[in-house]
Amino acid sequence: MPVKEKAALLVPSGTYHEPDKKHLHIICSDPDAKGLVVIVGISTYTNDLCDQTCVLQAHEHPWLRHQSFVLYRKAEIVSAAALQARIQSGEVLECDEVNAQTFLRIKKGLCKSPQTKRKVKRYLGC
């Protein structure tokens, strides 16, 4: 699967206690002329201190097991080629795309969230 908007990936994000843990990440843009894309992670919703911009329910993606939220503060602009290389090496795993409605909520949240970095907002034209 090519690196493109709506693609969902499982990216290594383990902790000391769970080094093999992976979190769901969503690619939020197609590659631009420089081959860059915006990617954002999904994390477990633990309390009201979590970013409220886009809260997801377990039924919104097969990988989600419980209520989660989009971790806009860690949204990044990354090289699509580097991401593709990580997929080909098996470090990053591909999974089912996000449905169109959920993706639209995630993408709109990049501009709405007060936690999205300024450089990501500028890149997206927010």
Model regions and ranges:
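C-terminal terminal-subdomain/extension
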Residues: 60-126
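Generic structural signal for residues positioned in beta-strands
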Residues: 10, 38, 55, 69-71, ...
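Mixed-charge, Lys/Arg-rich low-complexity intrinsically disordered regions
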Residues: 1-3
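Compact nucleic-acid interaction/catalytic patches
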Residues: 12, 17-63
